[in-house]
């Protein structure tokens, strides 16, 4: 009697902020797990996304963007989280953007050169490159930087060549038992996912107006007798002016954020959601390591 083989491994998705790492993760999983927004630093936790297909289970670690600015406690912790996730994986997907190459990309590359894991280079947003003639020389430049396992031009947004990345990942998964049941897509708690959804809506509807000094704490997450969830979210900002910005004129902004967040939660939790949001000023939290620990920013380090 033959025992079927199974394959399982951890894959880190790394790159500087805003190159499309979260969008790629969501595409690889076939649904939204990691929050995506055009603002840098939207991913603050190492979210694990799990994709199981037959005998193959790929466990994706979505890192915060490695970036050079290390002044604030939150930035230092995010950089530490990103660096630590590179160290304990079977494979790394290094995401860069089109024909752009920055000192931050160089810094990530230097960290990868120190590691032992093979690296796939995903050149994202190739559909946005205006001068297509620039692409080939740039790919040749990238190929000369490191001995990459493969270099794949992709568009995480449209899905172009994402299946190629997935196929390379499957091919390099070691023989191992699966860590998670096959219907799992993330090991993050519903409470954590609720806070991420609210934070995404804050980023989306406040855009460049709102600095990164905003976080979300879920104060209450309980099942109700209607078969759904009652969720209370506390939005923490650093200044009174930011609080007014989040609330908006006559509460219009926070109402929109709440409506959109509730829709996403209901889709993710497959149950009705009653969501209430509050905004509170807590000055200096992004500089205070103790406050960051209490908000779960270092729970996995």
Curated annotation (Swiss-Prot):
Pfam families: KH_2, MMR_HSR1. Residues 62-65 are annotated as: G3. The gene is era. It is found in: Cytoplasm; Cell inner membrane. This is GTPase Era. The keyword Phosphoprotein does not apply. It is a peripheral membrane protein. NCBIfam families: era (TIGR00436), PRK00089.1 (NF000908), small_GTP (TIGR00231). Monomer.
